[in-house]
């Protein structure tokens, strides 16, 4: 699998700008809308916080990160905890949930447009992240990819439960 974009930070940088713009516009164009959708949006936003924070804790504990180094500087593949559910909890699942949550809370076309564009870029960037992990961890990561979904946490939870039932 080839990288979609050669510059490693291009997609995430553009997606970041779109997400910041989406959030800023949501404050200005927050429409009265369906309260149920707003509640679902807030649930998405709080859930994104879980997927955003757990990798920091998990990588520090299980990733072989040297003291004083960034939690991203892992030396071993982590496939437990949140990483047994999704492969990209921060740059994938959390990002998508933030975009979705803001869309549902704001309920405005500008929020939906910016959010969808950011979601597409973040998802495509997860393919680049997979490629980087294959280069770093090799066949072990490719086998991990077969067990754990990229960003779909519902499918990840179902697969995890099924694996545990078989064990």
What are these regions (language model features)?
Residues 1-80, 94-167:
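Membrane-anchoring alpha-helices and their flanking helix-loop junctions
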Residues 85-93:
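Histidine-centered phosphotransfer motif of kinases
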């Amino acid at each position: 699998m080839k990288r979609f974009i050669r510059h490693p930070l291009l997609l995430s940088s553009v997606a970041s700008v779109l997400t910041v713009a989406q959030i800023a516009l949501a404050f200005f164009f927050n429409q009265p809308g369906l309260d149920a959708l707003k509640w679902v949006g807030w649930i998405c936003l709080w859930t994104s916080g879980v997927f955003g924070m757990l990798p920091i804790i998990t990588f520090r504990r299980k990733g072989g990160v040297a003291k004083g180094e960034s939690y991203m500087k892992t030396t071993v593949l982590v496939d437990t905890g949140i990483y047994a559910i999704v492969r990209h909890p921060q740059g994938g699942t959390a990002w998508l949930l933030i975009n979705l949550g803001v869309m549902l809370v704001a309920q405005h076309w500008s929020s939906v447009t910016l959010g969808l564009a950011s979601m597409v870029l973040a998802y495509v960037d997860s393919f680049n992240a997979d490629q980087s992990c294959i280069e770093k961890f090799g066949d072990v990561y490719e086998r991990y990819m077969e067990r754990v979904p990229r960003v779909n946490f519902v499918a990840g939870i179902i697969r995890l439960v099924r694996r545990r039932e078989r064990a």
